[in-house]
Amino acid sequence: MRVVFMGTPEFSVPILTAIIGHGYEVVAAYTQPPRPAGRRGLELTRSPVHEKAEQFGIPVFTPKSLKGAEEQDVFASLEADVAIVVAYGLLLPKAILDAPRLGCYNGHASLLPRWRGAAPIQRAIMAGDAETGMMIMKMDEGLDTGPVAMAEKVAITPDMTAGELHDRLSMIGADLMIRALGALERESLALQPQAEEGVTYAAKIDKAEARIDWSKPAKDVHNSIRGLSPFPGAWCEMEINGAVERVKLQRSTLGEGSGAPGTVLDDRLTIACGEGAVRLATLQRSGGKPLPAQEFLRGQRVTKVL
């Protein structure tokens, strides 16, 4: 079976690796173009999928768009049986969707139709969802609206971070995709339309959302911290030894106590919220590495959180 793989971030890599490992012929990998990196943006960084594909000697394509006739002709010339799409980052026009003999299949990190869109892992945790999952669907022209081929649910534990959920769903996605490809080869892959009720959209995370609002209930603050960990990272300003610094908050738990929002309630970094309190467990100063709260506080006095 001739496969075109389309993906960009680290989340996609285990699925690409599994497809290769199970003997499928990956004739090309499509990924986002290299991005400027470094302080001056003079270096170009290739995506994780780009790096992995080159390790296996797979031709890599990095178009900025797939809307043009030239890009669509190149894609069609690959004569793919199927395209596998996992966090690629570009919408696929009809000409691309129709080119593979068996269609295009997407690995999506939510229980559709909940959390269609760009940031399903973060949004599920930030909303306080108790469960999410991984789904394989056949793509159509809508945004994550196609019929579902396979799904697996995953519980979201109370202190689970987006990073932890990301890694788990990525591995589940690899297993589901291999099963889906096998069923597709056997012509036994059954498709079920998505429910019409319960549709929500997982908008891309806005930078402004990363700043913690201590006037919100502790539950919401805690969900924001873990839902934005490790990237982009929730943050706040702290008065440390008399100077105000910006600090990233990577882990937290629900705490006990009350007070004006932002009040430091004890020497274990329990912070009062609009309702209840949150205990900060892992913090990161600018230019530093993430530290457990006890180590972060060594020789430091936090008097105020803004």
Curated annotation (Swiss-Prot):
Entry-linked InterPro entries: Fmt, Formyl_trans_C, Formyl_trans_C_sf, Formyl_transf_N, Formyl_transf_N_sf, Formyl_transferase-like_C_sf, GART_AS, Met-tRNA-FMT_C
Q: Which PROSITE patterns match?
A: GART
Q: Where does (6S)-5,6,7,8-tetrahydrofolate bind?
A: 110-113
Q: Which GO terms describe its cellular component?
A: cytosol
Catalysis: reaction(s): L-methionyl-tRNA(fMet) + (6R)-10-formyltetrahydrofolate = N-formyl-L-methionyl-tRNA(fMet) + (6S)-5,6,7,8-tetrahydrofolate + H(+)
Return the EC number.
2.1.2.9
Keywords annotated in UniProt:
Protein biosynthesis, Transferase
Q: Which GO terms describe its molecular function?
A: methionyl-tRNA formyltransferase activity
One Pfam family, please name it: Formyl_trans_C
Could you say which enzyme class this protein belongs to?
Answer: transferase
Top-level taxon of the source organism: Bacteria
Q: Which PANTHER family does this entry report, sorted A to Z? A: METHIONYL-TRNA FORMYLTRANSFERASE, METHIONYL-TRNA FORMYLTRANSFERASE, MITOCHONDRIAL
HAMAP family given in the database record: Formyl_trans (MF_00182)
| The family this protein is said to belong to | Belongs to the Fmt family.
State the function annotated in the UniProt record.
Attaches a formyl group to the free amino group of methionyl-tRNA(fMet). The formyl group appears to play a dual role in the initiator identity of N-formylmethionyl-tRNA by promoting its recognition by IF2 and preventing the misappropriation of this tRNA by the elongation apparatus.
Q: What is this protein called?
A: Methionyl-tRNA formyltransferase
Q: Which organism is it from?
A: Brucella canis (strain ATCC 23365 / NCTC 10854 / RM-666)
User: Which gene is the coding source of this polypeptide chain?
Assistant: fmt
